[in-house]
């Protein structure tokens, strides 16, 4: 049987399994290029990748002389630095450390907000709790989404830091949170967000909401982390924040860029907040040369096929929206965007039954049912090599199973 990787093996293979382009990695090995480098240096390939990531993050061609000016910039909202790590959790943790370093000394240097209590703003769930966000598996990142509640309570009680959730797509509530938590003894340490909440129903934050939030953050000296671990390498231009016209201070990148070949995440940062010393940011395997080559291969493919990627993504999301509208007995619409589209169901049972049926038909998608306040959805993340013909076939299979699901429900009435 032929299986369709409808979630790209949890976002790792934008170009599918065994993409021929990654054969260049074997050629590099044959030429004697090693993967490992000394852990406080970077090889030529990694340095080249850093330049190209910064260029892409700023909407520039890597050969544009303007990239050299960006690399020395130290302004909020201008991404000019790359810290090479290994996993997305470490990338996000680096951003959190840089946010906290404005409140607590790392190496004896004075900090701008000494004595204030740092407050992290994160996206709320539909009940106002913390489970709407997901920023990795380190301890502090897990407290942002409601894990370690006793630990978090003690940290807050001791005045170490506080976590506050902000409602989804509510501009007024965000501005009020900024106003409230910038009064002594508190100070907003940062706003952490994804653009598409793939761990919470595939809900998409709107461009209007995010632009308003970014402006409120800029006005209050609050750095912004745009967590693109799951959305990077899935859009023309490589980063979804570019399509929104956003200017984050930190961007996490990983998963898709490595094409499933190597774990190799990075944090892109504004030089204005790059406060970690060399050994405060170092990860032994972060600078691997062949991992960087995998990034460059993925980026070259996406940049050469941007129009196709955009067209297929639009066709899939539009087709999914039309499809759910034809099945109102079980569907409530769509969430997400382009290849990262989620079908929203009226019940958890329907979402689970639909995904089970699609799995039997050799399509790998899954129902998100493990969070009590999360909308029941079937999540997809199609590989970028998906064609419009494949989208048509996939939607036809969806239609058949939704029709069968509606029929089964009617038979029970």
Label each PLM-derived region with a short phrase.
Residues 3, 7-63, 80-82, 297:
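Glycine-rich phosphate-binding segment of PLP-dependent enzymes
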Residues 12-15, 22, 52-193, 207-208:
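PLP-dependent aspartate aminotransferase-fold enzymes
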Residues 176, 196-220, 280, 383:
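Active-site core of PLP-dependent enzymes with the aminotransferase class I/II
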Residues 194-207, 222-244:
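Conserved PLP phosphate-binding loop immediately N-terminal to the Schiff-base lysine helix
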Residues 245-276, 287-294:
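Active-site PLP attachment segment
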Residues 285-308, 312:
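Structural motif of enzymes handling amino- and sulfur-group chemistry
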Residues 302-305, 376-413:
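PLP-dependent enzyme catalytic core of the Aspartate aminotransferase-like
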Residues 313-317, 327-359, 376, 384-388:
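Conserved PLP-binding catalytic core of the aspartate aminotransferase-like
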């Amino acid at each position: 049987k032929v299986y369709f990787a409808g979630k790209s093996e949890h976002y790792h293979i934008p170009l599918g399994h065994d993409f021929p382009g990654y054969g260049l990695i074997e050629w590099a090995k044959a030429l004697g290029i090693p993967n490992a480098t000394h852990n406080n240096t970077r090889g030529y390939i990694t340095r080249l990748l850093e330049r190209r990531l910064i260029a892409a993050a700023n909407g520039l061609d890597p050969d544009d002389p303007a990239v050299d000016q960006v690399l020395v910039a130290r302004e909020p909202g201008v991404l000019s630095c790359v810290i090479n790590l290994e996993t997305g959790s470490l990338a996000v943790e680096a951003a959190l450390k840089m946010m906290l370093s404005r409140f607590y000394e790392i190496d004896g240097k004075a900090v701008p907000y000494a004595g204030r209590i740092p407050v992290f703003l994160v996206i709320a769930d539909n009940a106002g709790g913390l489970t709407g966000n997901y920023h990795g598996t380190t301890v502090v990142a897990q407290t942002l989404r409601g894990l370690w509640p006793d630990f978090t309570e003690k940290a807050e009680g001791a005045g170490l830091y506080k976590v506050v959730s902000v409602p989804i797509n509510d501009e007024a509530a965000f501005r009020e949170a900024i106003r409230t938590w910038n009064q002594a003894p508190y100070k907003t340490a940062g706003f952490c967000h994804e653009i598409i909440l793939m761990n919470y129903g595939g809900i998409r934050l709107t461009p209007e909401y995010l632009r308003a939030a970014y402006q409120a953050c800029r006005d209050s000296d609050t750095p912004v982390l745009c967590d693109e671990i799951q959305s990077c390498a899935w859009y023309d231009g490589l980063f979804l924040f570019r399509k929104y016209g956003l200017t984050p201070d930190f961007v996490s990148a990983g998963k898709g860029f490595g094409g499933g070949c190597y774990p190799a995440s990075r944090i892109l940062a504004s030089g204005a907040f790059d406060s970690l010393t060399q050994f405060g940011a170092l990860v032994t395997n972060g600078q691997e040369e062949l991992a960087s080559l995998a990034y460059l291969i993925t980026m070259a493919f996406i940049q050469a096929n941007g129009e196709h990627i955009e067209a297929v993504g639009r066709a899939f999301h539009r087709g999914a929206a039309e499809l759910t509208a034809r099945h109102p007995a079980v569907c409530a619409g769509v969430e997400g965007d382009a290849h990262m589209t989620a079908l929203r169901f009226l019940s958890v049972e329907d979402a689970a039954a639909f995904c089970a049926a699609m799995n039997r038909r050799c399509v790998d998608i899954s129902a998100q049912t493990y969070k009590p306040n999360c909308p029941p959805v079937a999540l997809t993340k199609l590989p970028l090599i998906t064609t419009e013909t494949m989208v048509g076939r996939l939607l036809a299979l969806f239609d058949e199973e939704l029709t069968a699901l509606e029929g089964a429900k009617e038979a029970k009435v």
